[in-house]
């Protein structure tokens, strides 16, 4: 599960960094999604904050449990992976409904949706 540790660190630290730079407003305008300053779209984006922070918290907690050889790490990792998948899926569904196919927003969300699938299957197989 060494590779899962790498994915969790990239994803969880990445989410925390994304929200910090979003909060302080240093994302260059060229990287902002279409209609970023529309209050409804801004609210939609901020609605992901609690979900993304839960992903980071559960992922990092899972790594802590794993390092202590605590068997609960698998359950916490599964929670983090399912939340990560949901986060990517929700964003891609939104962009699809809007017919907005900006690769700079699609790639990160495809990553969030696809990488967890492998580990979800792996963890479920280990439990049975």
Protein language model features and the residues they cover:
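Hydrophobic transmembrane helix segments
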Residues: 11-54
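Membrane-helix boundary connector in multi-pass membrane proteins
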Residues: 89-106, 122, 128
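Non-cytosolic membrane-interface motifs at loop->transmembrane helix junctions
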Residues: 34-42, 98-111
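Hydrophobic alpha-helical membrane segments
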Residues: 52, 75-93, 109-117
């Amino acid at each position: 599960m060494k590779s899962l540790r790498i994915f969790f660190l990239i994803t969880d630290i990445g989410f925390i960094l994304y929200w910090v730079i979003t909060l302080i407003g240093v994302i260059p305008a060229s990287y902002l999604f279409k209609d970023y300053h529309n209050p409804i779209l801004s609210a939609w984006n901020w609605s992901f904050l609690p979900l993304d922070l839960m992903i980071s918290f559960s992922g990092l907690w899972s790594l802590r449990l794993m390092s202590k050889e605590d068997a609960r790490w698998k359950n916490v990792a599964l929670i983090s992976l399912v939340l990560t998948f949901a986060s990517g899926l929700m964003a891609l569904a939104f962009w699809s409904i809007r017919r907005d196919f900006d690769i700079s927003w699609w790639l990160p969300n495809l990553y969030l949706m696809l990488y967890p699938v492998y580990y979800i299957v792996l963890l479920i197989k280990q439990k049975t």
